[in-house]
């Protein structure tokens, strides 16, 4: 009996050490950026950032903590112009029902200047509802606003994380999990 307890302890301890190692607990990160870094204030829950050819940044943001606490707050896409003096964040989202909770974003700029934005959306209800729980929202970006074009969803989007627009009608999307259940995703994370 005593040997079995020691054996189980070693297995559990080894699993904990492996998980800590995989999570980077024993790594030392050294700064290696010699440029200036500045913080953009006012963005809560920034998930992704992409730049237009003119240097304008588009930032996806969703206050996930407020949703955990029961808030119906909608996520957004901000515009930020880092080269402009005293530039303020501009909330680009059109007035929509709740249900927009962005993750990864991507832009595609056509030669004629028309710009498209795609955003991974993790929704549970609202305007962009789909039976799959996730969708890709496609917008037209026009200087200081977004116009919603359409939603795309399907069974292959199990847990979409990021997106790359190839053109206004095609994109690649990554799933960060293969399982759609919470328990399956937890096993994927810890039993890689």
List the predicted regions and their residue ranges.
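Positively charged n-region of N-terminal signal peptides that target proteins for export
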Residues: 1-4
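Blade/loop signatures of beta-propeller domains
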Residues: 9-35, 75-80
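A short helix->beta-strand "capping" segment at the edge of beta-propeller domains
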Residues: 22-44, 85-91, 145-146
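Short extracytoplasmic
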Residues: 37-63
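Blade-loop segments of beta-propeller domains
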Residues: 40, 45-46, 64-66, 70-111, ...
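Residue position within the beta-strands of beta-propeller blades
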Residues: 58-60, 119-120, 173-174
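Beta-propeller blade signature
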Residues: 73-84, 131-143, 190-192
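Asp-box/WD-like beta-propeller blade repeats and closely related beta-sheet repeat scaffolds
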Residues: 93-109, 114-170, 178-181, 185-186
